[in-house]
Amino acid sequence: MTTTKLWGGRFTAKAAEWVDEFGASIHFDEQMAAEDIEGSIAHAKMLGKQQIISESESAEIVAGLVALKKELDDGMLAFDVKNEDIHMNIEVLLTQKIGAVAGKLHTARSRNDQVATDFHLWVKHRLPHVLDALTELQETLLQLATQHAGTIMSGYTHLQHAQPITYGHYLLAYCEMFQRDYDRFEFNQKHTDMLPLGAAALAGTTFPIDRDFVAEQLGFNDIYHNSLDAVSDRDFALEFLSNAAMLMMHLSRMAEELILWSTYEFNYIELSDDFSTGSSIMPQKKNADFAELVRGKTGRTYGALMALLTTMKALPLAYNKDMQEDKEQVFDVMDTVLAAIKIFTGMLSEITVHKERMLASTQDDFSNATELADYLATKGVPFREAHAIVGQLVLTGIQTHTPLQNMALADLQAAAPQIEADIYLVLQSETAVNRRTSIGGTAVANVQKEIARQYKNLEARQ
């Protein structure tokens, strides 16, 4: 491949090959080849429309770019590190195909606004995939929540048994988190859906370009209204990484619970063989490796966010070469997020829930203590006093290995005369769950209503 520099005229000496290799980005920004061609086609059409170049020249350039796009789709394009980046590689290939007229493509354009446009397009094209994947994950969670709206389990604070809840209620909590993730990625589209092209290097151009035409051709909803901002803004990429970090944090929290709950100590759930691995030495092992990998890749995502924040934190306006370092993190995190969501969707769709074990966990853990305290409060006992009374009963129960619901009525009444025989119904896990009827509570009827509400939210996306 013939090599050239877009900026060679100013220089009298040629850089060493190893220096050029250090500055090259083609090994990663080739991922934007389709976007670079797409942006160039729109730009070439605009140049012809505005008579900045002739219509025949515009048509010839567009035809050459379309041919390159087909070769790209067919896996026939080869890029050369000596041509530094995707923009120079495409221009060299176009020149080989149509000759010197290819040099007119860069009229009224800089690589500064060109790369910003490519990057915007790349993220813009892929954000819908994230939204679709999140929708599928939420649908899977809702299907599972529907099956387990009444499956009773222990709820936890500080990883200690707290109060009985339903597994469906637990799953809906993650649905809420993923809904917020969806909303953030959806809003991310607004700042991604802006066209930088036309800002040129930093100050705009003297040519009579039509930026709105290019925006329409590329499907952008708006244009940047300040040329300095257009070439130096990477907020949309930082928003994506920040949103991805929060999403991965949510997945990681759930992964931790899946890992814990699949152990013999908990035995609440079992992951399918498709999403488990074994040991090379211990025949009995069934490891939650894929949940662990999602948890591990969360740190990778955090690192990408911090890397780009650090890169951008002291850059003067407008473009700086530091910004070449903006893409690898985004490319990697996009792949990571899509893979992690897919893994979770599959893992949850094949999960086995041990309902009896979940219910059993609520029988001897004193998680019904709050029910007794609330019961006393309804009998006129100040809650703080009721709390202390029940605390003493729990201590007695621990010492005698007797759950509250198994204590004799006389012993309960010795601690609090207000207690009557109906307390045994109150202390049942099912009663404890279904008494939580406040909005957002864990009562089965609430969970069912919430499932219906969240399904409506998903239907509204269609």
UniProtKB/Swiss-Prot annotation:
Keywords: Amino-acid biosynthesis, Arginine biosynthesis, Cytoplasm, Lyase. Pathway: Amino-acid biosynthesis; L-arginine biosynthesis; L-arginine from L-ornithine and carbamoyl phosphate: step 3/3. Its main location: cytoplasm. Pfam families: ASL_C2 (PF14698), Lyase_1 (PF00206). One of its GO terms (cellular component) is cytosol. Coiled coil: none annotated. It is found in: Cytoplasm. PROSITE patterns: FUMARATE_LYASES (PS00163). GO terms for molecular function: argininosuccinate lyase activity. It is an enzyme of class 4 (lyase). Its EC number is 4.3.2.1. InterPro entries: Arg_succ_lyase_C, Argininosuccinate_lyase, Fumarase/histidase_N, Fumarate_lyase_CS, Fumarate_lyase_fam, Fumarate_lyase_N, L-Aspartase-like. It catalyses: 2-(N(omega)-L-arginino)succinate = fumarate + L-arginine. GO terms for biological process: arginine biosynthetic process via ornithine; L-arginine biosynthetic process. Belongs to the lyase 1 family. Argininosuccinate lyase subfamily. HAMAP family: Arg_succ_lyase. This is Argininosuccinate lyase. It comes from Leuconostoc citreum (strain KM20). The lineage of its organism: Bacteria, Bacillati, Bacillota, Bacilli, Lactobacillales.
